Design a protein with these regions (language model features):
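Core SAM-dependent methyltransferase catalytic element
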Residues: 70-76
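Amphipathic, hydrophobic secondary-structure cores in small proteins
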Residues: 8-63
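Intrinsic-disorder/low-complexity, polar/charged segments enriched in Ser/Thr/Lys/Arg/Asp/Glu/Gln
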Residues: 5, 34-36, 68-70
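Short, low-complexity, intrinsically disordered N-terminal peptides in bacterial proteins
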Residues: 1-4, 76
Length: 76
């Protein structure tokens, strides 16, 4: 069963803003909580997985819907 999920909508912002908002959400989230980041800056496709690897978080899912990227990330 999946745990709770927090949505971070960073559409309309350029990197590094989506990554900074993701960091803030992960820092505040209890362990085991997933954070879904929505971004439309193509650089997020590179920045977000790199950031997740740096902090030891797991990228559970990456999807594209038009120009919107959706990342599901969890840090245990």
């Amino acid at each position: 069963m999946a745990g709770p999920e927090i949505i971070v909508d960073a559409r309309g912002h350029r990197c590094p803003v989506p990554t900074l908002r993701l960091r803030r959400a992960l820092d505040k989230a209890p362990p085991g909580t997933s954070v879904r980041l929505l971004a439309d800056d193509p650089m997020a496709q590179i920045d977000v997985p790199h950031f997740a690897a740096q902090i030891g978080a797991t990228v559970l899912e990456v999807t594209h819907s038009g120009a919107v990227l959706s990342f599901l990330i969890r840090r245990d």
